[in-house]
A protein has these predicted regions:
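A structural connector/turn signal
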Residues: 68-69, 95, 140
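Generic structural signal for buried aliphatic residues
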Residues: 78-81
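A short beta-sheet element
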Residues: 83-123
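Non-catalytic DNA-recognition/assembly elements of restriction-modification systems
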Residues: 2-38, 157-206
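Basic, amphipathic alpha-helical recognition segments used for DNA target recognition
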Residues: 15-18, 106-156
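Short, surface-exposed loop/turn microsegments at beta-strand edges and helix-strand junctions
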Residues: 32-40, 59-60, 72-74, 92-104
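Sequence-specific dsDNA recognition surfaces
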Residues: 16-31, 48-76
Length: 206
């Protein structure tokens, strides 16, 4: 079970009392057998980065046989949890809303104002919670966690203000790490270019 200090009402609450927790869409149920006008970006396992972000370039296109209801599409504030290792949770924002979420994931949609999605996103990605998820998942042959396990998590909530402080710092730190990775990638390209040019000049000088 998941425990968080709570200073408001006291007592434990299950995640399902604060949010809807359900599996994503079984794609075969709504998939068109022929080219369709109802095309949606699809969140697949390749999209999910270990740091808890979605790589949009990896998304597939899902062709549905009919317009999909909102319940099948990601919404800003949703938390998508990968059902298989490493059980990464991602927070949906404006850039990743409106995407089909497959049954490879659990969709958590917070419905109670006493729980901030950004805080729950941080919490689900902590080592302590990942370890509990892993312990549950390894008890079955597929090594996958299910929606019921997440729905039954017991929460003891922090105040909304404390949740906000933690989540803001987490998002700031995550953004800084992303920028540092981008900078490191650009430097690698720069160094490779300089070395390549130096090699070419050296060859011409022979």
């Amino acid at each position: 079970m998941l425990f968080i200090d709570r200073d408001r009402r006291g007592g434990r609450m299950k995640l399902q009392d604060l949010a809807s927790v359900r599996s994503g869409l079984v794609l075969s149920r709504k998939q068109a057998k022929e080219p369709s006008e109802y095309r949606y970006p699809l969140i697949n396992l390749r999209c999910i980065q270990q740091e808890g972000t979605i790589q949009l370039k990896e998304a597939d296109i899902y062709e549905a046989k009919e317009p999909l209801k909102e319940e099948y599409l990601s919404q800003s504030g949703d938390i998508i949890v990968r059902l298989t290792s490493p059980y990464t949770a991602v927070l949906i924002d404006e850039t990743t809303s409106g995407m089909v979420v497959s049954s490879n994931f659990v969709v958590i949609r917070v419905e109670d104002k006493s729980l901030l999605p950004e805080y729950l996103f941080w919490l689900l990605n902590t080592e302590k919670i990942k370890r509990k998820i892993y312990e549950n998942a390894t008890s079955n042959m597929l090594g996958a966690v299910n929606a019921r396990f997440l729905a039954d998590f017991e929460l003891v909530l922090l105040s909304v203000e404390d949740q906000r402080k933690i989540s803001q710092f987490n998002l700031l730190a995550k953004r800084e790490r992303q920028l540092l990775r981008m900078l490191a990638d650009e430097k690698e390209k720069y160094y490779a270019g300089v070395l390549n040019q130096a090699y070419k000049r050296a060859k011409k000088g022979k």
